[in-house]
């Protein structure tokens, strides 16, 4: 495919892909798909390289959409979720400073199949950050600017990311700004304690007020409420925002089509949180 500079959705924009691509390494089915929006053939009709070179003849640009009807015994709805856009937090500098990234982007950096093959490197210059700051609740529990609910997963994946950083960057310093640590699961509290006590992650209870760049460094300004709201200023090489989880676009429409319940935030609702946590109110449809 000649179109090789399309930002990769799976790598959260940190890498590039072609117009014909496998969505991600463990995709099921593990088959290539064509991005019609960026495919040169669909845009101007002047390309057809992949159709000519496909060894199995599986690509047919003239193929039209068709409706398929299948009878099944059960349906499992697994649509996942999205992360909240960070545009409403201009004081954090996301989109303005290349080294302010989201937790999902850090996850791809830490992955062996990611754009840096598992090495933690700054998007701006490819250097290894020696000091990193994680900002928890970047949008969660904030009715004024974000969403009112707790996303539930941010505390734990932030602790995991901080531990991964300490394991990969020996001698590096990591800081986590948090409101409260909500480690509600088996051995979750012990996991966070291990990050603090064994891996040396510095937890600061307080909100970040502003992030700006100075002399090639990111200046993170906040407060430490455990020290009487004392001002805290950290000169960091990279900042990671634990952005809030929100329902997928179109989740409400899908729920109405399938006649399943959903909450005010468009998340699908289970039949009973304790007795039937994976069943919906419609028989045969599961979450």
Regions found by a protein language model. Name each.
Residues 1-287:
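Residues forming the flavin
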